[in-house]
Each structure stands twice: as structure tokens, then as C-alpha cells.
Design a protein with these regions (language model features):
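Extended ligand-binding clefts on enzyme/binding-domain cores
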Residues: 55-56, 265, 279-463, 468, ...
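Conserved, well-structured interaction surfaces
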Residues: 87-164, 199, 203-208, 217-229, ...
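Short, surface-exposed recognition loops and adjoining beta-strand edges that mediate ligand/DNA contacts
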Residues: 31-33, 67-72, 161-181, 225-328, ...
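Bacterial Sec-dependent N-terminal signal peptides
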Residues: 3, 8, 15-43, 212, ...
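Membrane-proximal, proline-rich intrinsically disordered regions
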Residues: 20-74, 133, 342-345, 353-359, ...
Length: 634
């Protein structure tokens, strides 16, 4: 049920962000007096960290129930490889796809600051309640968990909120009111008073990383030797993984920093911590069977051996599994019959990325290409899939209408090989609904995903199928961070060896043909983009490396002019502003807010929906196709 958590230490949080925070919990309220009276009450408060991450809500702020995973994929909608086909008007994911993320003029861009400061409040409350002089070993572990999570939250938030001036000279942007160079976010800890919170300027990014690195050092100290009970708890391997992320971030922004300017040192540390995380975790990369399992694929932390840290929805927490329009299984589901948007809003891979990915790479099974929508049991012998057209180009196969809509809903008419498509639901059901009549204008060039499966493969029952786990950290990320660090230290050969070692577990014939640092970097980021599509990591990499957003080209699978973005280097839609509650409650931020440039400046002025549609199905040349701006790859 939904409860308010009232704690004496609310002074340690931003008043405007926490006055009406709600968590979607299956348990009763935990109040401050209980914390000091029993270890079990403290443990309940720690558990609220995990429940908060699968169901945060703030009704006063206009925040629907949203999870950590849903926030991450919301951010990823602003990147090149994430395409949003189908009926996606009037929804926040569509807004992020086009860059309509004003935090003061709508509810689209307000989620990051509300959500992360809500999370930070929870861990601050626990930290503030523990007396080090009288703490038990269990309490010290709780401290370690809280410090690790606080480092995670601030690391995410500072990357989201740091303003980077757009560099694409084709467009004119709104400038900030004040100089935002190297500014991060207001820092709120367990020691921040209410008075301080009401006049709390944006700390520099360097100062935020001071806190992050300090918190990780505390987490490392308190979690040393601890054997966790569940993957929702950070352990030492996760702390090392967070260190690897932090030093990768620092190495990538030395030219913007005031304090953290030792690029070579940070790349070296990033590689060392990635290695330590791999060794400490005992995790191995996902197998094809684990990845594609229709019942547990990307939804079960225990069956996914590579997952180092995860969120989890308790079976009794049906509200977190079903409430609102941001349930992760709903957002990313293709085969489900439940939800608000459900299968009518596709989450798809960019067409050029799909075409570039080798057919020998089993990760390609994560998306449905044109052959899936064309294939039927009466296809021509020897042909990969059926495409029959008359002289005018109209489809004439008896399963299709000239508009390209599937008119047959009979499973017997279609190829439903479970070994090939790995659906719990029938492939024919998916085909009969993902088509032009349901708003998928780019049909059959859709590339909608089936990477994220409903819990237990249950595509009918929301309370069950919606209760999915989400990977916060996977060991595969550590291999990519190691390869990137090697590319910036020991060189191309070492980075290629690490990259090839990982990708050969996905495609046994893989070989990286690139020979220069820039080209190896580009290939590394492409493979990482495929690996972590839909998990949010690509957003942080794109913004960190200023790779631009290149979702439009003739033959692209985008469906709306507002989504057809071709932006070099820094996309304005990556950076929301602070919400009105924060601006009004913390006047020190008011004149230092991130500016908002309307997406119409860089989208609809260039092309129309009809112009986009006229190019569907055109041949595209993958070799030389621009996926990333590579200036920072040198």
C-alpha cells in the first residue's frame, strides 16, 4: 500500500522535495522513534530503500509511481539507438524521445530531481539514525549499503543535471541566465539542516564527486567481508564497480573540471577497479539461454548470473507491479496483454544499428525485424521470408491487406516456432497487433524489442507479469569499462582483446576489424550500446562522450518528425531543469537553472511525417553510417 514515511531527520532532505514523498510498500509505516528502539525497525528502514526504488510517488509534485529502472529507460529515450514507434503521443517517454523535457513548464522533465532526491532522503535518514559509537556490526553493514546507494544516486543525478552547452551550429539555443560551468547539483546529506537546504546552491561537479568518492570509501570499509543476502544489497564488488564508473566519468571530463584533472590517473584507476569488480563479483556474462528465456529473460535477478546489483518487486507488492504508466514491464513489454500503453507503444532499436549487428550475434534476437512481420507458414521454399508484391508494389500475399495490416488473428496461419521466437505468448498474437492499424506507421521496419520479458512469462496477469527485476549493474559493464580504460592507457591491442573476449560470448566468430583508437572506440561504444539497450547506461555514455543524437537518415525507422533528430555532439534534450518546487524552495538555484530549448527548433522545421514515411524501406549503407560523433574518441 502507499504510505508516508515521517522521520525526525527530514531536515536532512530538501523540504520541497520530501514533504509529500510516498513509497509503494507492502508493509506498515516506519516512524523515527522505532528506529532507535530495535534493530529490526532499522532493518525495515533499510528495506524501504529497495521498495522505494521500485515504486516512488509524489502526488503534490505530479509524479506518478515510477521505478529506478523506468527512470533509466526514460532517459535513454533521448539517445540514438532508442526509437519509440507506435501510439506514443501524450506520454512522457515520447517527450524524452523528442527532447520536450522542460522541468518548469510540464511534468516531463521533473522526474529526475524528484526521484533521486527522494532516494537520497531515504538513505540520509538511515545514516543519520545510526550512532557509530553504539553501532552493531549489522548497523555498520547498513551504513555501507546506504553509502553505496548514495554514491550511486549522486553519480546518476550529477550526470543528468550537469549542463553542457550545445555545439551544433545549425541551430539556435536558449542560453542559461548564469554561468553554469562545472556546476552539478545541490548536495544534501544526513547533516544538512532545513535552513541550509532552503539556500543550497548547486555544488560544483568536483564537489559532488568529492562526496561520491568519500561515500564509496565508507561503503568499501563497512562492506568488507560482508556476504549479502540478496542482489538488491550492494556488496564489495558493486562498490568496486561504482568506483570504476566514477573514475571513467572523471577521466572523461578533465577539461571541464577544477580539481579532478589527472586524466591518465583516472583511466588507470577505472581499469583497476573494473578488474577488481569482475574478480570480486564471481559473475559471468549472460548466456544466450539466460538472455532469451521467455520466462526469466531480463526479469529475474537470481537466474541472470551476470547481474551484480538489481531492484526487485516483492510478490506482495502488487501496487509497484501495476500502478500507473511507468511499470517497467509495461514500458518495455511487447508480448503482454496488460498495461496502460503496453504493446501499443513500441520500444525499438534504431534500424541502422539492427542492420549493422551481425546475424551471428544472438543478441539480435532481442528485436523483431521485418522478416518477423512478413513470415507465414505458406512462405516460398528456400526464401528467408515472404514478400510478394504486385506490379504496383502492393503486398498480395493472402495474409496481408494492401495497407500492410495483418488481417488474420488465427495462430494456425502463422509461423510460431517457439524455438525461434521464444514467446510465451504466440508470435501470431504479436503480429496481429503490432501493425499500422495500431499506430505503427513504420511497419514492418519496426525493430521492436522482446529483450525484457514479463515476470514468469506471464503476459496476461499484470500483478504477476509486472513484478520484474531490473539490473542496476551487470558484470558485462565492467568489461566495457576495462576495455575503454585500456584504450586510453595501454592502447588499442589490449582494448581490442578485452572487447573481443566479451563479444565472442555473443558471437563466436566476432573479430574487431578496427585498428585506430578512434575506430576501436566507435566499435566499443556500438557493442556497448547493443549490450545495454533499454537499461539506461547508453544515456550516460552518450552524454559523457558527447556522441550526439543521430536518429534521422533516409530509411530510418522513426515515425514522427519530432523524433527525427540529427544533433551533433550535445543534445539539449539530455539535460532537464530543476522542478518548480526546488526553484521556489531553494532560491540559490533559481538563477542557475538549466535552460530549455524547445524541440521544434531542431526537429519539425526540417522535415514532416510524410517525408519520413516516404523513405521507409530504403536501402541504407551501414558502412560509414554515423552512429556517434567521435571527437572525444581521439
Amino acid at each position: 500500500m502507499k504510505i508516508n514515511i515521517a522521520l525526525a531527520s527530514t531536515a536532512a532532505a530538501l523540504v520541497c522535495l520530501t514533504s509529500c514523498m510516498q513509497e509503494v510498500l507492502p508493509t506498515e509505516s516506519v516512524i523515527s522513534d522505532q528506529i532507535g528502539q530495535s534493530a529490526s525497525a532499522l532493518e525495515g528502514m533499510v528495506n524501504s530503500i529497495y521498495t522505494n526504488m521500485v515504486g516512488y510517488k509524489n502526488e503534490d509534485g505530479g509524479i506518478e509511481t515510477i521505478s529506478y529502472g523506468s527512470m533509466r529507460v526514460q532517459l535513454e529515450h533521448s539517445t540514438t539507438m532508442m526509437v519509440c514507434p507506435g501510439y506514443n503521443g501524450f506520454n512522457t517517454m515520447g517527450a524524452w524521445t523528442q527532447g520536450a523535457v522542460s522541468a518548469s513548464g510540464s511534468n516531463r522533465g521533473i522526474y529526475p530531481t524528484y526521484l533521486y532526491y527522494g532516494y537520497i532522503k531515504t538513505v540520509n535518514d538511515v545514516i543519520g539514525m545510526i550512532d557509530l559509537d553504539n553501532a552493531t556490526d549489522e548497523m555498520l553493514v547498513d551504513l555501507g549499503i546506504c553509502y553505496a546507494y548514495r554514491a550511486l544516486y549522486y553519480m546518476d543525478l550529477v550526470q543528468i543535471m550537469e549542463y553542457k552547452k550545445p555545439l551544433d551550429s545549425r541551430y539556435t539555443y536558449v542560453d542559461p541566465k548564469s554561468d553554469l560551468s562545472n556546476l552539478g547539483v545541490p548536495i544534501v546529506t544526513d547533516k544538512t539542516t532545513t535552513q541550509e537546504a532552503s539556500n543550497n546552491p548547486r555544488a560544483t561537479v568536483d564537489e559532488v564527486y568529492d562526496l561520491i568518492l568519500s561515500d564509496l570509501a565508507e561503503a568499501e570499509k563497512y562492506l568488507a567481508g560482508y556476504t549479502r543476502k540478496d542482489k538488491v544489497e550492494p556488496n564489495l564488488a558493486v562498490v568496486y564497480g561504482l568506483f570504476a564508473r566514477a573514475y571513467t566519468n572523471l577521466a572523461s571530463r578533465t577539461e571541464r573540471a577544477a580539481k579532478y584533472t589527472s586524466k591518465a590517473e583516472y583511466w588507470k584507476l577505472a581499469g583497476e577497479y573494473a578488474d577488481k569488480a569482475i574478480a570480486q563479483s564471481g559473475c559471468t556474462p549472460l548466456t544466450e539461454a539466460q538472455w532469451t528465456d521467455p520466462k526469466t529473460g531480463f526479469n529475474n535477478r537470481n537466474s541472470q548470473n551476470s547481474w551484480m546489483l538489481a531492484t526487485h518487486i516483492d510478490p506482495n507488492n502488487t501496487t509497484a507491479a501495476t500502478d500507473g504508466s511507468f511499470v517497467y514491464a509495461m514500458i518495455m513489454g511487447t508480448e503482454t496483454t496488460f498495461s496502460v500503453y503496453g504493446w501499443r507503444v513500441g520500444r525499438a532499436l534504431d534500424r541502422a544499428a539492427y542492420d549493422r549487428l551481425s546475424d551471428n550475434d544472438w543478441r539480435k534476437k532481442s528485436w523483431l525485424g521485418p522478416e518477423f512481420f512478413y513470415e507465414s507458414k505458406n512462405q516460398k521454399a528456400g526464401e528467408a521470408y515472404l514478400i510478394e508484391k504486385d506490379a504496383n508494389g502492393n503486398l498480395i500475399n493472402n495474409k496481408w491487406a494492401t495497407a500492410g495490416n495483418n488481417k488474420s488473428t488465427e495462430q494456425g496461419d502463422w509461423s510460431d516456432d517457439p524455438g525461434k521466437y521464444q514467446f510465451s505468448n504466440s508470435a501470431s498474437w504479436v503480429r496481429s497487433r503490432i501493425n499500422t492499424s495500431y499506430g505503427f506507421k513504420a511497419w514492418p521496419w519496426l525493430y521492436v524489442n522482446r529483450k525484457f520479458r514479463p515476470n514468469e512469462g506471464n503476459y496476461n496477469t499484470y500483478e504477476v507479469g509486472g513484478a520484474t527485476d531490473f539490473p542496476i549493474m551487470r558484470v558485462e559493464e565492467m568489461y566495457f569499462l576495462k576495455a575503454e580504460a585500456e584504450l586510453n592507457t595501454t592502447g588499442v591491442a589490449a582494448a581490442k582483446a578485452t572487447l573481443e573476449g566479451l563479444i565472442k560470448t555473443r558471437n563466436s566468430s566476432y573479430s574487431c576489424a578496427a585498428t585506430t583508437k578512434k575506430d576501436v572506440y566507435e566499435e566499443l561504444m556500438f557493442q556497448k550500446g547493443i549490450e545495454f539497450w533499454g537499461e539506461g547506461i547508453n544515456y550516460f555514455d552518450n552524454k559523457r562522450l558527447e556522441t550526439g543524437c543521430h536518429r534521422w537518415y533516409p530509411g530510418a525507422s522513426v515515425e514522427r518528425a519530432a523524433h527525427a533528430i540529427d544533433m551533433n555532439r550535445i543534445h539539449p534534450g539530455w539535460t532537464p531543469g530543476f522542478n518548480n518546487a526546488e526553484l521556489n524552495g531553494n532560491r540559490a538555484v533559481y538563477d542557475f537553472n538549466n535552460p530549455y530549448t524547445a524541440y521544434s527548433v531542431y526537429t519539425t522545421a526540417l522535415r514532416t511525417n510524410d517525408e519520413i514515411a516516404s523513405h521507409y524501406g530504403e536501402a541504407i549503407e551501414v558502412e560509414g553510417h554515423k552512429f556517434f560523433d567521435t571527437e572525444k574518441f581521439e
